A protein has these predicted regions:
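Conserved Nudix-box catalytic region and its N-terminal flanking loop in Nudix hydrolases
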Residues: 22-39, 51-91, 95
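Helix N-cap/coil-helix junction residues
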Residues: 98-101, 183
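A short coil-to-beta-strand element that immediately follows conserved catalytic motifs
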Residues: 100-109
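Histidine- and/or cysteine-centered catalytic micro-motif in compact active-site loops
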Residues: 47, 60-62, 76, 111, ...
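Acidic, metal-coordinating catalytic segment for phosphate/diphosphate chemistry
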Residues: 1-50
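Surface-exposed, flexible loop/turn segments at secondary-structure boundaries
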Residues: 15, 50, 63, 114, ...
């Protein structure tokens, strides 16, 4: 995360508050129920003959301030002021893991609320027929790792950052999305 970013704020109905952002260098706006912070989340997945469905995880570098050395979702972060949800998802995938994706590559999975005023718009990207050329900023991401989807629960319990260890709803929604779209 860059400390000079302005995060887009939203009304409780999900509409962006025009021209209103939260300075990310300040404390988080968790005390204001009327302002919601948006997060774009991207799960990169692929199907292989060996392991079936796999999810891509990123390991956070030792030098980051939040959750160093823990594994995290493929990519994700706050939506910048004036940025659309799709633009944020594309940007975060590029910035965090060097994945060059287009808006058409993103498939909407679900929206999840967490904390009292944070909402994550969750997308999936099929990487099945692509070459693994992930280039990432070593200061933020140490490595990326493909993990069989059937091992998700065990993997996140052992290696994921604390907030993901207890987040079963997101992964259940992802599983349902995979099932309804013929990946599982």
């Amino acid at each position: 995360m860059h400390t000079d970013e302005m995060w887009q704020l939203y009304f409780p109905n999900g509409e962006p508050i025009p021209g209103v952002g939260w300075d990310s260098a300040r404390d988080n706006p968790e005390e204001k129920d009327s302002e919601i912070v948006g997060v774009a989340v991207v799960f990169v997945f692929r199907k292989t003959k060996e392991n079936g469905l796999e999810l891509l995880w990123q390991k956070r570098s030792a030098g980051v301030s939040r959750f160093p050395g823990f594994y995290d979702i493929s990519a994700g972060g706050h939506i910048n002021l004036g940025e659309s949800l799709i633009e944020a998802a594309v940007r975060e995938a590029r910035e965090e893991i060097g994945a060059v994706i287009s808006p058409e590559d993103l498939s909407f999975v679900t929206v999840r609320g967490f904390n009292k005023n944070r909402f994550a718009w969750i997308y999936a990207v099929d990487w099945t027929d692509r070459v693994d050329e992930f280039r990432f900023d070593d200061e933020e991401v140490e490595e990326v790792k493909w993990v069989p989807f059937e091992m998700t629960h065990e993997f996140k319990e052992k290696y994921a950052k604390p907030s993901l260890k207890k987040d079963n709803l997101t992964f259940e929604a992802l599983k349902i999305w995979f099932e309804t779209h013929g990946y599982l």
